[in-house]
Amino acid sequence: MIKLRLLFTTLLAIISLAAAAAAKDITMGFIYVGPKDDYGYNQAHAAGKEGVSKLPGVKTVEEAQVPETVAVQETMRNMIEIDGATVLFPTSFGYFDPHILKVAKQYPKVQFLHCGGLYTPGKHPANVGSYFGYIDEAQYICGIVAAHTSKTGKLGFIAAKPIPQVLRNINSFTLGARTVKPTITVQVIFTGDWAMPVKEAESANSLIDQGVDVLTCHVDSPKVIVQTAEKRGIYSCGYHANQSSVAPKGYLTGAEWDWTSVYSMYAKLLQEGKKLNDGGIPHLVRGGIKEGFVKVSPYGPAVSDAAKKDADAALAQFKNGTMVIYKGEIKDNTGKVVIPAGTELKQQDPVLEQMNYLVEGVVGSVK
């Protein structure tokens, strides 16, 4: 019996070693447009990089503060030729066209996975893919909490650019808020770029001066906006990462990423030898709260029990897949019907990734 046990243990060890050997060693390269400690977009991706780097057989390299210019092309080439990267994650929106598309053609054996871009079959190289999370689900919940908290009925949203992902966040936040208070408004200011701290502070103060009492945003680093809200004695909802430490009184909740789960999924597929080129890795990967791509920050001390109840109910619906944010009739803020009555657009519907409008209740323009 002892000999049999020893034999069984030995066989298990051999199988484990064989499985480990079968998993390919990979080098994953991560590129950020801003600093890794920005309390926001880049910090969230850097945290994901740290998470995946703990997996066996995974080596990671990274470079921060790489502008959306030809500079990112040089960074990508260096990671491939010097560091031996076999997969790259250029994380900023502006890296995609033309930079990723150009370099991907030059290195057909390297996988290029872009955060937020769209892959079009036949138009884009086969070794290019796109991943993103339905973080507008968390924004919808933030809208519920913000509406419960607001006394003026005026919410503020500071955003970088009116691209589809940003518009979707603004609209979902507004639709969530209007489930609580149907006449509440969300005033939007676009700063023009992802990291404009002076303009972000000016925009925050301007909105507060106009009666806004809850602020949120879609910029690379929400820190300035959240801090300004705290200094002015109003409330805020965070974005990308948890900013509660810079606003202990007024931070309500926030929409956060969990990139570790996403990057770990890619690492597993790549170690199995799968590629974008042969269909082993999907060209478009999306997920929300249910899939663990995004989450909601813990509630702050100013959040009421009523707000928690409604927010938790919506969270449960996202988790079980029954929540549909975009169901008609929905009008834009010019009065035009953009989603007819009886129409439901589920999160994975590609129509939502082409969003070019602001919903009713938003004060602002995409032009």
Feature locations, PLM:
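Bacterial N-terminal signal peptides that target proteins for export
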Residues: 1-8
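Bacterial N-terminal signal peptides
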Residues: 9-18
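A residue-level marker of the well-folded mature domains of exported/periplasmic proteins
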Residues: 23-367
